[in-house]
Regions:
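Conserved small/polar residues in nucleotide/adenosyl-binding loops
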Residues: 257-262
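Short acidic alpha-helix that forms the nucleotide-activated donor recognition element
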Residues: 72, 232-244
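Acidic donor-binding loop of glycosyltransferase active sites
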Residues: 241-255
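Short amphipathic alpha-helix
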Residues: 20-31, 192-193
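Extended catalytic core of nucleotide-activated donor transferases of GT-like folds
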Residues: 9-11, 29, 42-123, 130
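Conserved catalytic-core segment of nucleotide-activated headgroup transferases in glycan assembly
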Residues: 156-233
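Donor nucleotide-sugar binding/catalytic pocket of nucleotide-sugar-dependent glycosyltransferases
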Residues: 107, 120-164
Length: 262
């Protein structure tokens, strides 16, 4: 497994949950397997991050926050749904013109549109063709430069970190949701949905990613729903081990996932 790209830079730092941070984590794993030299330029101090030691063991090169001095002309610099990356584009482009934005959402950010107008983004990457076809025409109207590329890629998922769970406790029915704590990640009727569905055994909920912002949006969860602020309190693996079903209503869509049965 190899790559024609020998080194790349990413603005940000991976995390154990949350879409963009998790995607970056898994991509770094496969990039290093492919022999790519990976540089991280975070927006904050990263030494206390849960994945710091793993990044060291993988041989990832980490720079001081917002320090672009190591970037050379021709180096690709990526931002995974990162507002800080969009704001730093003028400085980044003083070092390289190979700027790549991966928008993990289904909408465009105002600063993303502005960057397109100014020609600050050389490539847009999307996880699926449907989102690309929706976003590309809107951005093309802002800047018709044919050199700006719009491509899709297949995100890497490190399945080894999530072994198949064949058996779960039969004494209760585990349900839950997992996301960052932002209010937009929660539908206002989340608790109504959780309270309304029935189970032949006791229900036990788990909300991984919950704080005062979440509570201000939906209210205080029922006593039978455990809340965890982030992955430092409950790991992704423990969340999926608990959950037979994931009910994830948000402001924009309602996703229903079920765990495979034995």
């Amino acid at each position: 497994m190899s790559s024609p790209i020998r080194r790349l830079f990413v603005n940000g730092f991976p995390s154990l949950y949350g879409g963009a941070g998790t995607e970056l984590h898994h991509q770094i794993i496969v990039w290093r397997k492919m022999g790519v030299e990976v540089h991280l330029i975070p927006s904050w101090d990263y030494h206390g991050e849960p994945l710091y030691n793993e990044m060291v063991s993988l041989g990832v090169i980490m720079h001081a926050p917002a320090d672009w001095s190591a970037v050379q002309p021709g180096d690709p610099v990526l931002g995974f749904c990162n507002a800080g990356f969009l704001n730093a584009l003028p400085e980044i482009r003083r070092h390289t013109k190979r700027t790549v934005f991966i928008n993990c959402m289904t909408w465009l950010f105002p600063r993303e549109k502005e960057a397109m107008q100014k020609g600050e983004i050389a490539m847009f990457l999307y996880q699926n063709e449907a989102v690309r076809q929706e976003a590309m025409p809107v951005l093309r109207k802002l800047n018709g430069d044919p050199q700006v590329q719009f491509l899709t890629f297949r995100p890497y998922f490190h399945a080894e970190s999530f072994p198949f769970i064949r058996e779960r406790d039969e004494d209760f029915f585990g349900c839950g949701r997992i996301s960052r704590q932002d209010a937009d990640k929660f539908a206002a009727n989340t608790l109504h949905i959780y309270g309304a569905f029935v189970s032949p055994v006791e229900k036990r909920g788990l909300f991984l990613g919950f704080d005062k912002r979440s509570e201000a949006k939906i209210g205080r969860p029922f006593d039978w729903i455990r809340i965890a602020r982030n992955q430092r309190e409950v790991s992704q693996q423990d969340f999926y081990r608990h959950s037979r079903i994931i009910l994830q209503p948000t402001d924009t869509t309602c996703l229903l996932y079920t765990s495979p049965s034995p």
